[in-house]
Amino acid sequence: MLKRNVSVAVAAALALSLAACGSSPASSAASSEAVSSEAASSEATAAPAAGDFDVDQDITVISREDGSGTRGAFIELTGVEAKNDAGEKVDNTTEAAAIQSSTNGVLTAVSNDETAIGYISLGSLNNDVKAVTVEGVAPSADTVKDGTYTLARPFNIVTNGEAADPVAVDFIAYCMSTDGQALATEEGYIGDVGADYTSTQPAGKIVVGGSSSVSPLMEKLIEAYKTVNPNATLELQTTDSTTGVSGVLDGTYTIGMASRELKDSEVEGGAKATVLAKDGIAVIVSNDNPTDNLTVDQIKGIYTGELTTWADVQ
């Protein structure tokens, strides 16, 4: 009895196999087409889910703090800063903006929030966020250099009058040398040709402080300079541009860092700027945000609070 049941099962399996092999080309094609159609339908259904973004969401505005050179340059270049009836410059950044006190703070805030927008030094841009094009122009060393990307500013070395400290004089000469400017370019900034340089090997300690945007480049320059002149000690303190300038004038810093032009009042107080390099200001959004381009007027509207949702800039 067991042998008979096995024989029946084998025969049934063989019949099914022969039926499948004997399928007509038309039925096979139809079956294949049905499978393909089903796969295409599934893919079409899944595609929007992968890029789903609600444009009606409120924009989370991320800004730098008062005193930041990046903020100062950004609001000037975008028109967020404007003169009032008395002719005084006023920063019209929306009060709803979330304030971050460093470049890394802005990067973290934007990367963790799909509705956020921020601005940072181009040299600090990484893959955690997306830089939008401005007026259709992508931020890069080349577009900053040729002027087609308009959100750009200088990185300044600041001293109290002419530098007098031997280490400061030698270090600044290194920064402006062929090697120093090449390093700036390698780090993603826009350096100059640079001058010939031979270290005088001075000994002593200086303190360099200021802008958090300039700080990453300055750190690289200090590391490189120490290999040229091991006799010197350089301490780097990262704060902001305004503190960088005031620190030089009150003696806290030997050299200041500012990621903006000096104010008239600072120059009148004795501050002297030397352009270390040029840098773009990248406007950044989350990698999950489909927005790829903004106009300067749209950026201004977002930061003054006139445009409040992502639908307003589509």
Where are these regions (language model features)?
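Exported/periplasmic ABC-transporter solute-binding proteins
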Residues: 22-35, 39-314
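C-terminal motif of bacterial Sec signal peptides marking the signal peptidase cleavage site
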Residues: 16-20
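Bacterial Sec-dependent N-terminal signal peptides
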Residues: 1-9
